[in-house]
Amino acid sequence: MASSTFWKSWLGVLLLAGLQASAQNVQPIRFIVTFPPGGAADQVARIVAQETAQILNTPILVENKAGASGMIGADSVARAKPDGKTFLVGGNGPTVLNQGLFSKMPYDPEKSFTPVVGLAKSPMLMFVRKDLGVSNLKEFLELARKRNPPLSMASAGIGNITHITGEYAAALMGFKVNHIPFSGSAPAVTALAGGNVDLMFDPLPSSMQQARSGLTVPLALMDDQRFPPLSQVPTLKESGFENMEIIAWFVLLAPAQTPAPIVMSMNKAVNLALTRPELIARIQGIGEQPLAGMSPEQAAEFIANERQRWLPLIRQLGIKPE
């Protein structure tokens, strides 16, 4: 009896050791973020990775590979093996805008990746310094259209979505701006809150806190519906401007030639994660909305539509990086 108990105990130890070794030998999945830690892309990636890892029972590591307008990180994914272990958290810039800004790129945005699934979106917020003397869009336009010299407009950098959005909106609304580029949204928003520039268009993750705290004055959301944490801010559509919805977005992409079963497995896991109330609350807490329910084909169509919209506009506005 004692011998039987001994061997059962020993077998249990061996099985546990084998399971632990198997878990340790699981190769983690990598989500590559093309911007530094702490930004919207990084936060979205980490929130989604945590939930998706639990669903897949596989660790997911978030790696930040910033530089060259997101092209360093994107190129690393384009060159990765299509084995389901490396994915790109792709945003407007590396996935679409750079194609209209740079004549030479280390990867082909249209051929180097396989779209997998949507992740999150954030509407652009139009906001001004608090001592500009306006409290709504109507008052702002009355001031901006007659201002000479033009109002100063901050952006996160030349060719950035914040820059292109601002130039586009100014042209459609009938006012001019003096563009002041910064090296990222954080210093640009800080300059606006400090009264050093007049105006900015920025995604909610980097602009919402200042708007809610009263350091800046939010005028309008560039979306088709209001955002719950800023429910008092009207949309541009409510203010009389149709078809001006502009969002900053993130999608998940795999290297080209990634097998369809791998793509579908990740698609289903991420879409399931995006339905969980805890994730939705965390995503909304940073100023994003889940971009849930997309099939790989729908993700590809979404990117293609964004490309058709923005590339001609970049050429029309004549925006080029320095």
Residue positions per predicted region:
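Bacterial N-terminal signal peptides that target proteins for export
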Residues: M1-L11
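N-terminal signal peptide c-region/cleavage motif recognized by signal peptidases
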Residues: G18-Q20
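N-terminal (or domain-start) structured segment
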Residues: A23-K111, P150-S152, T162, L172-L199, ...
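An extracytoplasmic/periplasmic, membrane-proximal ligand-sensing/linker region
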Residues: V26-P28, A260-E322
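Hinge/capping helix and adjacent helix->loop/strand transition within the periplasmic-binding protein
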Residues: R79-K85, G100-P187, L236, W249-R282
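Beta->alpha turn/N-cap motifs
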Residues: V89-P94, N98, S185, D202-S207, ...
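C-terminal lobe and pocket-closing loops
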Residues: K121, S135, S207-T275, N305-Q308, ...
